[in-house]
């Protein structure tokens, strides 16, 4: 009984696959795709620029750079003092 039902389903699926894509799903022409490449690249560049600017502004406004700088300064001074006391 299962084989009797699965064969027609298999035939219908095979027919749909062999039919190919519908006209609305067909790939666009190469020339139209090539014409849109500069616009897409410009849009990508603008988006990337905006995101980079936003990230840089976020970093500038955060306390992370100042905290990092202070930590490095403190650590460097501690190491310098330890070296002075060790080799003096």
Swiss-Prot record:
Q: Where are the transmembrane segments?
A: none
Location relative to the cell: Secreted
State the UniProt keywords alphabetically. Lipid transport, Secreted, Signal, Transport, VLDL
Q: List the Gene Ontology MF annotations in alphabetical order.
A: fatty acid binding; phospholipase inhibitor activity
- What's the chief localization of this chain? secreted
Query: Which domain of life, per UniProt?
Result: Eukaryota
UniProt xrefs under InterPro entries: ApoC-1_sf, ApoC-I
One Gene Ontology BP term is: negative regulation of cholesterol transport
For the keyword Glycoprotein, the answer is no
One Pfam family matching this protein:
ApoC-I
Where does the record locate the signal sequence feature?
1-26
GO terms for cellular component:
high-density lipoprotein particle; very-low-density lipoprotein particle
Give the function comment from the record: Inhibitor of lipoprotein binding to the low density lipoprotein (LDL) receptor, LDL receptor-related protein, and very low density lipoprotein (VLDL) receptor. Associates with high density lipoproteins (HDL) and the triacylglycerol-rich lipoproteins in the plasma and makes up about 10% of the protein of the VLDL and 2% of that of HDL. Appears to interfere directly with fatty acid uptake and is also the major plasma inhibitor of cholesteryl ester transfer protein (CETP). Binds free fatty acids and reduces their intracellular esterification.
The family classification in the record reads: Belongs to the apolipoprotein C1 family.
Task: Write down what this protein is called.
Answer: Apolipoprotein C-I
Question: From which organism does this entry originate?
Answer: Arctocephalus gazella
Organism lineage: Eukaryota, Metazoa, Chordata, Craniata, Vertebrata
